[in-house]
Amino acid sequence: MGSDTRHETATAVADHLERLGHTVVRCGAVGGVDTPWPEAADEVARLVAQRAVDTGVVCCWTGTGVSIAANKVPGIRAALCIDAETARGARRWNDANVLAIGLSNTDARSAERIVDAWLETRDVDPTEAENIERVARLEQRYTRRQR
């Protein structure tokens, strides 16, 4: 779980995850150190990509910056989710593995509902497997070109 700035919503989400029994790796401001949003997102995304953690949550003012930055890490499918249904869909239809939340428009209780939906949705819709694989091929194609 990472954020660029200390914010009650980000802290509430980390605390909520711990209350649910999850081990939370606190990155960036969630860990007590204000961190530029690209670095906070990278720290969380690398942990997910390395499979050191099961999933990640990243936050910044709009959620857009951290989602863009996290998606630069190979193997990451970060989704900016504004409600529980978006979170469910991101997991079910896109196999998203990093949740991005905007702090400017998401209060603590709403963020907790989004996180709950994210965690409760574990199974990817099998009819989307081919599309998810297409995204993986796109990533491989463009990652190879940039080396």
Regions found by a protein language model. Give the residues of each.
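Helix-loop module immediately N-terminal to the HCX5R catalytic loop
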Residues: 34-45
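Short amphipathic alpha-helical segments
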Residues: 12-15, 68-72, 112-113
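Glycine-rich phosphate/diphosphate-binding loop of Rossmann-like nucleotide-binding domains
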Residues: 1-20
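Helix-adjacent hinge/juxtasegments
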Residues: 43-80
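A short beta-strand-loop structural module common to alpha/beta enzyme folds
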Residues: 23-35
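Short, structured coil segments at secondary-structure junctions
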Residues: 20, 73-74, 94
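C-terminal binding/interaction regions
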Residues: 2-8, 84-147
